[in-house]
């Protein structure tokens, strides 16, 4: 895989994008369905170097989740209205 070969020749991974840097580590976010989460980290996929958001549910068993950054920050359409998938709440 070309991406993997390029990564193996680099001494350090590329810097995180401005979008990744805008994610507030430790911040609370609300999913568009109403459930609260805390962002644990922004990470990289080991093979593709894609940016990922690691977050934890603030309900139930407190499960850990990982979602590609572009999905975490995208808008979703519900009942013909656009909403952020996750909204920063503090």
What are these regions (language model features)?
Residues 1-90:
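Mixed-charge, low-complexity intrinsically disordered regions
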């Amino acid at each position: 895989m070309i991406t993997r070969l390029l990564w193996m020749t680099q001494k350090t991974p590329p810097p995180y994008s401005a979008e990744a840097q805008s994610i507030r580590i430790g911040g609370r976010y609300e999913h568009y369905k109403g459930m609260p989460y805390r962002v644990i980290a922004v990470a990289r996929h080991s093979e593709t170097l894609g940016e990922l958001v690691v977050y934890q549910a603030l309900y139930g068993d407190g499960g850990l989740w990982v979602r590609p950054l572009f999905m975490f920050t995208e808008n979703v359409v519900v009942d013909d209205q656009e909403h952020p998938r996750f909204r920063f709440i503090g």
